[in-house]
Amino acid sequence: GNEYLDYDYVVLASHADQSLRILDQPTSDEKRILGEFKYVANTAILHTDENLMPKNKLAWSSWNSISKEDLSKTCVTYWLNNLQNLKCEENYFLTLNPIQKIETDKIITSVNFTHPYFNLRTAKLQNELFSLQGKKRTWFCGSYFGYGFHEDGLKSSIEMIKDFKK
């Protein structure tokens, strides 16, 4: 709602662009740094369709890339049984941004989300993210502190907690 809540501290564990939108009165540094991080839409499909894997099963790996001839579109299929050490007979895959059809009856679920898009500017600004910590009692963490992976979000939260405790 529109009610005003008062807190001692705020931790924004979200994407940089979301954090910036949440802030009622962002500082000039928060605008400058967080505002540079852009995000791209992605689709992830959990499925059992082996057609998105190499034809030769000996070539299967945890991460499998498929691209078109012009290389403008590339997708990745993760072989979850291998990647997550799943002990089951059926093979499970997670495909990001598929460029070929996945058999409908083999789709388990689909989810849309965004990932940070990094460039030279944001790579340089990552070092400045730490200068925002604790200003106006606001703390930040998220995958944009690293390479955009979930593990980077976790790592940034651990680092944030260490700074918070000082």
Regions from the PLM with identified roles:
Residues 72-166:
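Conserved flavin/dinucleotide-binding core of flavoenzymes
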Residues 1-116:
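Mid-domain catalytic core of redox enzymes
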